[in-house]
Amino acid sequence: MSKLNIIFAGTPEFAAQHLQALLASQHNIVAVYTQPDKPAGRGKKLQASPVKQLALQHNIPVYQPKSLRNPQAQAELNALNGDVMVVVAYGLILPEAVLHIPRYGCLNVHGSLLPRWRGAAPIQRAIWAGDQETGVTIMQMDAGLDTGDMLHKVSTKIEADETSASLYMKLAKLAPPALLAVLDGLTEQQFKPEKQDNQLANYAEKLSKQEAKLDWNLPAYQLAQNIRAFNPWPMSFLTVEVEGVEQHVKVYQATVLAHQYHAVGTVLQVDKNGIQIATSEGVLNITQLQPQGKKPMSVQDFLNGRANWFSLGKKL
């Protein structure tokens, strides 16, 4: 096992947890690449990414180019003499020229069992599609979008109540040891590259706020999957008219019930156990929700003072 000089590229907390694991290893982090500071909070002050904050705590040089396509940025990277570049949720596209700069190329930690769910939102789309399991893939990057050779996979079950938030945390614990195993065996080529089967590939499109609105023409099981997949962002929501004003209500938890046919979007039952709404297939029973300007709450708490919002027979 040889000590490697690693260039790390990542931005969010998920990436920072990988950097933390690398800092605790025998390997040497020669530099960190992360996205430029962005305005955040009510004051819109520039805020450093979690990866940058961690790197500065450990006195690691930080680079924040807006792009890696220009020759100057590539020359800077080349001068670092890295053995390998580790890329985790960086957010910038790496041009092909960059992929060949480090001695062992660029490794990527991807949040799915490739070739399933290539693309921007693999964790969320696995839940959205009703997958029973997912995991992480450590891959050798190439010029395509998550199309490189796979070096190592680790899988985990997707629980029935799993949200993207909980799965994100699960993979953040699962992935760093898998990455370290690959790095520790890199010089001896302990992990043999495996080609991806393009016929099994699908694409994890980015989530949108428009997609988060609950569509009662979808089956109840799909809406329940959406609610879990879109938590913590963009959060599934419904709209309901109350005294002539359209109210937006975020939905945090729901279960699926069977039913005989009813007109879609009809409120069928309202009690402390849930708000039951007819869909094209089955009933969605909403059990936790959040009115605008309030915290998430149980149906029982929601109905205190809002009992008229979801009257029986009301069409949403």
Swiss-Prot record:
Reactions performed catalytically: L-methionyl-tRNA(fMet) + (6R)-10-formyltetrahydrofolate = N-formyl-L-methionyl-tRNA(fMet) + (6S)-5,6,7,8-tetrahydrofolate + H(+)
Record's keyword annotation contains Ion transport: no
Pfam families: Formyl_trans_C, Formyl_trans_N
CDD domains named in the record: FMT_core_Met-tRNA-FMT_N, Met_tRNA_FMT_C
Residues that bind (6S)-5,6,7,8-tetrahydrofolate: 112-115
EC number(s) recorded for this UniProt protein: 2.1.2.9
Coiled coil segments of this chain: none
GO CC, alphabetical: cytosol
Function: Attaches a formyl group to the free amino group of methionyl-tRNA(fMet). The formyl group appears to play a dual role in the initiator identity of N-formylmethionyl-tRNA by promoting its recognition by IF2 and preventing the misappropriation of this tRNA by the elongation apparatus.
Protein name: Methionyl-tRNA formyltransferase
Organism: Haemophilus ducreyi (strain 35000HP / ATCC 700724)
